Regions:
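Non-catalytic regulatory/linker segments of enzymes
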Residues: 1-490
Length: 490
């Protein structure tokens, strides 16, 4: 191993004999721009192998992958590539999708060249340009080295390795073309297939997730340390969350220590600076804890990829607005061991449920996840009337009564939908009956309020013989047959 403070000329002298056939300017550029800690992380022979991989990079070959099997059924996967926005997340997602447990990782990024190129720490949606001149000199590069092992029941034979290499190349090419969303969707689809095979009962919350920040060790980066149990797809989900929040990973190290996973991220803000605001650090800490616990429950979701995507948006909604109130609510949520698998099932249930309902009801979601178990799926009309009356009694105007009525309706619909999704034993007829009973009470109360308003304006409606005019509201179709469901509009 070379010392982290070794002179660059000394490093060049050591590596040159090991890099026969590699142009001197390629070797010099690589040594000059790589992170100093990189050279102490690997023996000279391995460093030379990385240089040779970097020398193969071209506009049509922006990524080179090497996979070596080691003792005990472990594999070392080395990825040398041009640097792209969301690249680390894409790589971690693919490794998880192939059923590989990441036991150790060393992630390094080279410095900018004299003419800056777009990268992890640049505009999230850059206009890609082809490298000019000699390949390997004009763009930042990454060297990501993972030690992995297949999870129980998973194989990683030669054919699997070839498939991973090909798919990594395709995903990196998509990033090169600026097709970030397409790359993420393809990774998500593969992740779904893998996580679906790991469906198991939820084992409760993880033990304490320890997170610390340090701004004293590095001159350029905030160091974020996370110590916890390993969870499926955490690195993928967390790296995506950081990227979407304009927090960039310049370097990362992770390994198993005393049976716990230790992740160390070297991070910067979108301007390439340390994160110094205590509020930003607290929000990042909360984001990491929520994602860590959520990915632990992810195999409960009907559609894990959909759940991950919705959870990231849900997290933004919870934390926006009053930051202090949002944090307080979210920390309380973290402490409830029963809510994460329920949230995973809800967010992974359907696009309709998230887009049309959960997004609008996010403020009520956390309390409802805790309280829903206390109420039955089907409430009697008498019970619903009593609860609705309590919700409306303080409303003094027609507009206030209408708002209270709609709020009660939305909360009850949410409760019924949630009970049906998270409790597999509930039957469709019972689900439909619960919605139909609610609809009866809502329509009845709407009639009472409208009748009171119109009577006040025009008096009671009467027939030509002066007797009160009777009328009825008839429910046809699914309402009349008590077969209402998710698409029914009340």
């Amino acid at each position: 191993m070379l010392h982290a403070n070794a002179d660059r000329d000394q490093i060049l002298t050591t590596l040159a004999p090991l890099c026969q056939g590699i142009d001197r300017d390629i070797l010099q550029d690589f040594v000059t721009r790589m992170d100093p800690d990189y050279f102490s992380a690997f023996p000279p022979k391995t460093l030379a192998a990385h240089v040779k991989q970097a020398a193969t990079l071209t506009p049509d070959h922006p990524c080179d992958v090497s996979i070596a099997e080691t003792a005990g059924g472990h594999f070392v996967i080395t990825i040398v590539a041009y640097d792209y926005f969301s690249e680390f997340a894409t790589i971690c997602g693919l490794l998880s999708a192939f059923g590989l447990n990441i036991e150790e990782g060393r992630i390094f990024t080279s410095a900018e060249s004299e003419q800056p190129s777009r990268s992890r720490s640049a505009d999230p949606y850059p206009i890609r340009t082809r490298p000019q001149g000699r390949p390997g000199l004009t763009r930042k590069k990454i060297v990501d080295v993972f030690t992995v092992s297949p999870i129980e029941g998973q194989t990683f034979a030669a054919a699997d390795r070839k498939r991973l290499t090909d798919q990594l190349a395709r995903m990196i090419m998509l990033l090169d073309e600026g097709q970030l969303d397409e790359a993420r969707q393809q990774v998500n689809r593969q992740l779904v297939e893998h996580l679906g095979k790991r469906r198991s009962s939820f084992s409760g919350l993880l033990h304490t997730v320890q997170i610390t920040f340090d701004n004293s060790q590095s001159a350029t980066d905030t160091i974020m340390d996370i110590r916890s149990d390993d969870t499926p797809a955490f690195l993928y989900a967390f790296a995506n969350a950081l990227a979407m929040r304009n927090v960039y990973i310049s370097k990362a190290l992770f390994a198993i220590e005393d049976g716990k996973l230790h992740d160390r991220f070297y991070i910067r803000n979108r301007f390439g600076q340390k994160l110094l605001d205590p509020g930003d650090l607290e929000q990042l800490r909360l984001t990491a804890v929520l994602i860590k616990q959520f990915t632990h429950a992810l195999t409960w979701a009907p559609d894990p990829a959909k759940a991950l995507e919705a959870f990231d948006q849900f997290l933004d909604l919870v934390l926006e607005g009053s930051r202090q109130a949002g944090r307080k609510q979210a920390w309380a949520f973290v402490k409830d061991k029963n809510t994460f698998p329920l949230l995973a099932r809800l967010l992974g249930a359907s696009d309709f449920l998230w887009e049309d309902f959960l997004r609008r009801q996010h403020v009520n979601l956390l309390p409802l996840l805790k309280d829903y178990r206390d109420a039955p799926l089907i409430k009697s009309q008498a019970t619903l009337r009593k609860e609705l009356n309590r919700a409306i009694v303080k409303a003094k105007t027609d507009e206030a009564r209408k708002e209270a009525l709609n709020r009660f309706k939305d909360q009850e619909l949410f409760r019924i939908d949630m009970k049906h999704i998270v409790e597999p034993g509930t039957s469709l007829p019972d689900f439909s009956l619960a919605i139909s009973e609610l609809a009866e009470v809502i329509v009845e109360r709407s009639l009472v309020d409208c009748q009171a308003k119109l009577t006040k304006l025009y008096g009671s409606p009467r027939l030509t013989n002066k007797k009160p005019c009777p009328f009825a509201i008839l429910g046809a179709g699914k309402f009349g047959g008590k077969e209402m469901g998710y698409a029914s509009d009340i």
